[in-house]
């Protein structure tokens, strides 16, 4: 994202990464001659998932990375599995076990230490709240997929979500994208960064993630986000970002709590009704 921001605005990065991922998956969908399973009643859930799980995080994360660093932003994504447990109660009617409650409380304490450390290092409270809104919207989107869109094949679901997010973000990137200096040295780097982010980091990665959500449930699928904060810290350290001992300790604590919560969370794929799938 840092490389892409050399020439492209944050909203533009979100728009073009979603469009790039959608383009690749659409080509695969057409070549494979897949039959569409989308129904008119899926429109509202699809729009909600596209905005909460794609448009919002993909457009706000580049701005946050520029302000508070990729390592700190990546750490907040580690909260996704714990927040999924909380969101699953009202959206899916799934109540946490005592072990999961313990893990959520422990992770919230670690998150409090992480926020306190950020405030001590002059990170604006508004930036912290926006950063933690990302795993929250991810959790809501994951549960929404499980509740209302699980009858859609993962390829079609991901393709439609990315296309919808692109339709939302592309006009916004033109109206409120801001100006960036474009030069011959930075433009190829920024373009390559967005292309890689769109095709690999958004298209194929989200396709695999949505398949996990549908097959194993949002909690187990969100376990893959454990790799995000670890990779973000390593990348941030290599990129010269300031990483404190408190941040590392809080990250380790969050990962431990996530491991406790997700122990044995995988489940067998539930049967899918042949007629009248949930809308």
Q: How does the language model describe each region?
A:
Residues 26, 50-55, 59, 81-86, ...:
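Hydrophobic/small/kink-forming positions within alpha-helical transmembrane segments
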Residues 14-16, 70-80, 144-167, 198-237:
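Helix-helix packing/entry segments at the starts of transmembrane helices
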Residues 20-24, 76-90, 105-106, 164-168, ...:
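Alpha-helical transmembrane segments of compact multi-pass small-molecule transporters, enriched
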Residues 29-77, 113, 198-216:
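Specific transmembrane alpha-helical segments of multi-pass solute transporters/efflux pumps
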Residues 40-49, 96-108, 127-128, 152-162, ...:
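Cytoplasmic-side transmembrane-helix entry/capping segments in multi-pass membrane proteins
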Residues 2-3, 7, 21-39, 52, ...:
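Membrane-interface helix-cap regions at the ends of transmembrane helices
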Residues 2, 11, 21-26, 84-86, ...:
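Transmembrane alpha-helical segments that form core, pore/gating elements
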Residues 25, 47, 87, 96-117, ...:
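Hydrophobic transmembrane alpha-helices of multi-pass small-molecule transport proteins
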């Amino acid at each position: 994202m840092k490389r892409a921001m050399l020439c492209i605005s944050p909203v533009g990065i979100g728009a073009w990464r979603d469009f790039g991922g959608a383009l690749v998956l659409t080509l695969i969908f057409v070549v494979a001659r897949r039959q569409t399973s989308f129904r008119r009643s899926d429109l509202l859930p699809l729009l909600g998932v596209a905005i909460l799980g794609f448009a919002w995080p993909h457009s706000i994360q580049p701005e946050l990375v520029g302000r508070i660093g990729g390592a700190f932003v990546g750490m907040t994504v580690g909260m996704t599995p714990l927040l999924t447990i909380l969101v699953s109660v009202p959206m899916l009617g799934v109540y946490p076990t005592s072990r999961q409650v313990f893990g959520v409380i422990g992770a919230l304490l670690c998150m409090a230490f992480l926020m306190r450390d950020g405030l001590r290092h002059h990170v604006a409270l508004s930036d912290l709240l926006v950063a933690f809104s990302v795993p929250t919207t991810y959790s809501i989107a994951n549960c929404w997929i499980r509740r209302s869109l699980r009858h859609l094949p993962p390829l079609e679901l991901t393709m439609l979500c990315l296309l919808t997010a692109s339709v939302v973000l592309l006009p916004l990137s033109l109206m409120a994208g801001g100006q960036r200096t474009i030069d011959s040295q930075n433009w190829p780097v920024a373009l390559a960064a967005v292309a890689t982010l769109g095709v690999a980091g958004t298209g194929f990665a989200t396709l695999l993630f949505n398949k996990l959500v549908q097959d194993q449930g949002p909690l187990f699928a969100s376990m893959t986000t454990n790799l995000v904060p670890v990779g973000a810290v390593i990348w941030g350290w290599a990129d010269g970002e300031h990483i404190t001992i408190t941040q590392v300790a809080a990250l380790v604590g969050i990962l431990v709590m996530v491991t406790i919560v997700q122990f044995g969370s995988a489940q067998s794929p539930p049967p899918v009704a042949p007629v009248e799938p949930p809308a």
